[in-house]
Amino acid sequence: VNLIDAFGKATETNVPMTFYDKFSGDVRYNIMHTMNVKGNPDTINIDPLGSYNIVVHTVPPVSKDSIVLVPGTHNIIGIDAPQGDLVLKIDGKNDYRELKGIIRKSGEMNTIIAQDFNTSQRLIVGEYDLEILSTPRIYASNVHIDQSKTTTIQIPSPGIANFQYNNPGYGYIVQEVNNKLNLVHTLNNNATRESVVLQPGNYRVVYRPKNSQSSQYTI
């Protein structure tokens, strides 16, 4: 199986492949694509009877259907699978316990993968939209992944806002953006102290004690 890069060469490798029986849909083989000692795609021995649908588990996956093999010969199957790398990183200290970026194809809503920050992820060449699960959310549109190149998305280091109250209450954090206030976090209404990791920006807190029965006690 030749995994073809953007230049028409069989250089892509080290991804799992699944061979399905075309008619029954059963999994016939799971194989990790490998280059042999000569740097060529390794030859695999499989049953030539029947036909196969092949899925290459890149991100997102690529596939080729209705593969018919000729018995007793060296069959070559080419599948386009050009890949590059996406790195997500924070500029400085990371106060998040866990921060991920949701990756989608540009203009689509289906999630392809949730990538951890400070990691690298191989992706099929193309354009992607990112939703970073920070507070508040950060969005990046039309992020381009090129063949064998690394694209880096870096966000500013966050800060921590500490809250302490005499009594539990209803509290919300809103961000000031272009003279508008956008809700970014709901505070725990059963706690008297809380720490919230926030991206740099201007914020306001709206709070009222839980046992107060008048809006004039809003802070």
Q: What does each of the following model-derived ranges do?
A:
Residues F7-Y29, G92-N110, N167-V184:
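Short, ordered, surface-exposed loop/turn motifs in non-cytosolic proteins
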Residues L49, G72-H74, S148, P158, ...:
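Tight coil/turn sites that cap or link beta-strands
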